Protein backbone atom coordinates (compact mmCIF):
# COMPACT_ATOMS: atom_id res chain seq x y z
CA UNK A 1 0.00 0.00 0.00
CA UNK A 2 1.28 3.46 -0.91
CA UNK A 3 1.62 5.80 2.08
CA UNK A 4 1.36 9.53 1.38
CA UNK A 5 3.49 11.56 3.79
CA UNK A 6 3.91 15.01 2.23
CA UNK A 7 1.62 17.92 1.43
CA UNK A 8 2.43 19.76 -1.80
CA UNK A 9 1.72 23.45 -2.41
CA UNK A 10 1.30 22.88 -6.13
CA UNK A 11 2.57 20.63 -8.89
CA UNK A 12 4.05 21.22 -12.33
CA UNK A 13 1.57 21.12 -15.22
CA UNK A 14 3.15 17.94 -16.61
CA UNK A 15 3.12 16.07 -13.26
CA UNK A 16 1.13 12.82 -13.38
CA UNK A 17 -1.24 12.17 -10.47
CA UNK A 18 -4.08 9.96 -9.33
CA UNK A 19 -7.19 11.26 -7.58
CA UNK A 20 -9.15 10.24 -4.52
CA UNK A 21 -12.45 11.57 -3.19
CA UNK A 22 -12.61 11.99 0.58
CA UNK A 23 -15.32 13.21 2.95
CA UNK A 24 -14.75 16.33 5.03
CA UNK A 25 -14.33 14.18 8.13
CA UNK A 26 -11.49 12.23 6.52
CA UNK A 27 -9.85 15.37 5.07
CA UNK A 28 -9.54 16.76 8.63
CA UNK A 29 -7.34 13.85 9.72
CA UNK A 30 -3.59 13.61 9.24
CA UNK A 31 -3.69 9.80 9.28
CA UNK A 32 -6.24 7.81 7.29
CA UNK A 33 -6.79 4.92 4.90
CA UNK A 34 -8.82 5.24 1.72
CA UNK A 35 -9.47 3.51 -1.58
CA UNK A 36 -8.94 4.99 -5.02
CA UNK A 37 -11.76 4.66 -7.59
CA UNK A 38 -9.79 1.70 -8.99
CA UNK A 39 -10.14 -0.05 -5.63
CA UNK A 40 -6.46 0.31 -4.70
CA UNK A 41 -5.96 0.98 -0.97
CA UNK A 42 -3.78 3.90 0.08
CA UNK A 43 -2.77 5.37 3.40
CA UNK A 44 -1.77 8.80 4.64
CA UNK A 45 0.50 9.87 7.47
CA UNK A 46 0.68 13.60 6.88
CA UNK A 47 2.03 16.52 8.93
CA UNK A 48 -0.70 18.06 11.09
CA UNK A 49 -0.94 21.35 9.26
CA UNK A 50 -4.66 21.69 8.69
CA UNK A 51 -7.46 20.36 6.55
CA UNK A 52 -6.89 18.90 3.11
CA UNK A 53 -8.97 21.17 0.89
CA UNK A 54 -10.49 19.89 -2.33
CA UNK A 55 -7.80 20.13 -5.00
CA UNK A 56 -4.92 19.61 -2.53
CA UNK A 57 -1.99 17.46 -3.54
CA UNK A 58 -0.14 14.93 -1.40
CA UNK A 59 2.83 12.74 -2.25
CA UNK A 60 4.70 9.62 -1.19
CA UNK A 61 8.42 9.59 -0.36
CA UNK A 62 8.91 7.97 -3.79
CA UNK A 63 7.27 10.93 -5.55
CA UNK A 64 3.85 9.48 -6.38
CA UNK A 65 1.31 12.33 -6.37
CA UNK A 66 -2.36 12.21 -5.41
CA UNK A 67 -4.97 14.96 -5.79
CA UNK A 68 -7.58 15.00 -3.04
CA UNK A 69 -11.12 15.99 -4.05
CA UNK A 70 -14.15 16.59 -1.83
CA UNK A 71 -16.44 13.57 -1.97
CA UNK A 72 -20.18 14.20 -2.25
CA UNK A 73 -21.76 13.45 1.11
CA UNK A 74 -25.13 13.78 2.81
CA UNK A 75 -25.68 17.43 3.83
CA UNK A 76 -28.43 19.79 4.88
CA UNK A 77 -29.02 22.56 2.32
CA UNK A 78 -30.51 25.85 3.50
CA UNK A 79 -32.21 28.17 1.01
CA UNK A 80 -34.12 31.38 1.59
CA UNK A 81 -36.46 33.78 -0.17
CA UNK A 82 -34.06 36.67 0.39
CA UNK A 83 -30.31 37.13 0.75
CA UNK A 84 -30.91 38.76 4.14
CA UNK A 85 -32.74 35.67 5.42
CA UNK A 86 -29.84 33.49 4.27
CA UNK A 87 -27.46 35.84 6.07
CA UNK A 88 -29.50 35.49 9.28
CA UNK A 89 -29.30 31.71 9.04
CA UNK A 90 -25.52 31.89 8.55
CA UNK A 91 -25.30 34.10 11.64
CA UNK A 92 -27.29 31.70 13.82
CA UNK A 93 -25.42 28.61 12.57
CA UNK A 94 -22.10 30.40 13.03
CA UNK A 95 -23.00 31.16 16.65
CA UNK A 96 -23.19 27.39 17.15
CA UNK A 97 -19.71 26.88 15.65
CA UNK A 98 -21.08 24.54 12.99
CA UNK A 99 -18.82 23.77 10.01
CA UNK A 100 -20.67 25.67 7.30
CA UNK A 101 -20.22 25.89 3.55
CA UNK A 102 -21.39 29.16 2.04
CA UNK A 103 -22.53 29.75 -1.53
CA UNK A 104 -24.31 32.81 -2.95
CA UNK A 105 -27.68 31.00 -2.86
CA UNK A 106 -27.40 28.33 -0.15
CA UNK A 107 -25.73 27.20 3.07
CA UNK A 108 -24.66 23.61 3.69
CA UNK A 109 -23.99 21.83 6.98
CA UNK A 110 -23.65 18.25 8.18
CA UNK A 111 -26.96 16.55 9.08
CA UNK A 112 -28.33 17.69 12.42
CA UNK A 113 -32.11 17.64 12.94
CA UNK A 114 -31.95 20.13 15.84
CA UNK A 115 -30.15 22.71 13.69
CA UNK A 116 -32.48 22.00 10.76
CA UNK A 117 -35.51 22.68 12.97
CA UNK A 118 -33.93 25.91 14.25
CA UNK A 119 -33.32 27.14 10.69
CA UNK A 120 -36.83 26.12 9.60
CA UNK A 121 -38.13 28.05 12.61
CA UNK A 122 -36.50 31.14 11.09
CA UNK A 123 -38.63 30.59 7.97
CA UNK A 124 -35.99 29.06 5.71
CA UNK A 125 -36.17 25.85 3.67
CA UNK A 126 -33.94 22.93 4.69
CA UNK A 127 -33.53 19.90 2.44
CA UNK A 128 -31.16 16.94 2.45
CA UNK A 129 -28.82 16.63 -0.51
CA UNK A 130 -25.62 14.93 -1.59
CA UNK A 131 -22.92 17.50 -2.26
CA UNK A 132 -19.15 17.90 -1.82
CA UNK A 133 -18.55 19.64 1.54
CA UNK A 134 -15.96 22.41 1.66
CA UNK A 135 -16.83 24.47 4.75
CA UNK A 136 -15.31 27.83 5.55
CA UNK A 137 -12.07 27.53 7.48
CA UNK A 138 -13.10 30.15 10.04
CA UNK A 139 -11.29 33.13 11.47
CA UNK A 140 -9.27 31.03 13.88
CA UNK A 141 -8.41 28.08 11.63
CA UNK A 142 -4.64 28.53 11.95
CA UNK A 143 -4.83 30.34 15.28
CA UNK A 144 -2.57 29.22 18.10
CA UNK A 145 -4.01 29.28 21.59
CA UNK A 146 -0.72 30.42 23.17
CA UNK A 147 -1.32 34.11 23.89
CA UNK A 148 2.01 34.74 25.60
CA UNK A 149 4.21 37.30 23.92
CA UNK A 150 7.35 35.99 22.31
CA UNK A 151 10.53 37.93 23.21
CA UNK A 152 10.55 39.47 19.73
CA UNK A 153 6.90 40.49 19.88
CA UNK A 154 7.37 41.83 23.42
CA UNK A 155 9.95 44.33 22.16
CA UNK A 156 7.33 45.84 19.86
CA UNK A 157 4.29 45.45 22.09
CA UNK A 158 2.93 48.90 22.89
CA UNK A 159 -0.09 49.83 24.97
CA UNK A 160 -1.82 53.04 23.95
UniProtKB/Swiss-Prot annotation:
Primary location recorded for the protein, binned into one broad class: cytoplasm
Keyword Cytoplasm belongs to the record: yes
A Pfam family: UreE_C
Cited InterPro entries: UreE, UreE_C_dom, UreE_N, UreE_N_sf
Single GO term (MF): nickel cation binding
GO annotation, biological process: protein folding; protein-containing complex assembly; urea metabolic process
UniProt keyword Cytoplasm present: yes
GO cellular component, one term: cytoplasm
Superkingdom field: Bacteria
Subcellular localization: Cytoplasm
Keywords for this protein: Chaperone, Cytoplasm, Nickel
Signal peptide range in chain numbering: none
Known function: Involved in urease metallocenter assembly. Binds nickel. Probably functions as a nickel donor during metallocenter assembly.
HAMAP family with a match to the protein in the record: UreE (MF_00822)
Similarity comment: Belongs to the UreE family.
Name of the featured protein: Urease accessory protein UreE
Organism encoding this protein: Acinetobacter baumannii (strain ATCC 17978 / DSM 105126 / CIP 53.77 / LMG 1025 / NCDC KC755 / 5377)
Originating gene: ureE
Amino acid sequence: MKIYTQRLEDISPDQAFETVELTFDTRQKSRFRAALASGVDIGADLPRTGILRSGSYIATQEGDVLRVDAKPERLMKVTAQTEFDLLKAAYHLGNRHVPLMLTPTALYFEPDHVLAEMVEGLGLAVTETDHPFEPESGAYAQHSHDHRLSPIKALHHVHS
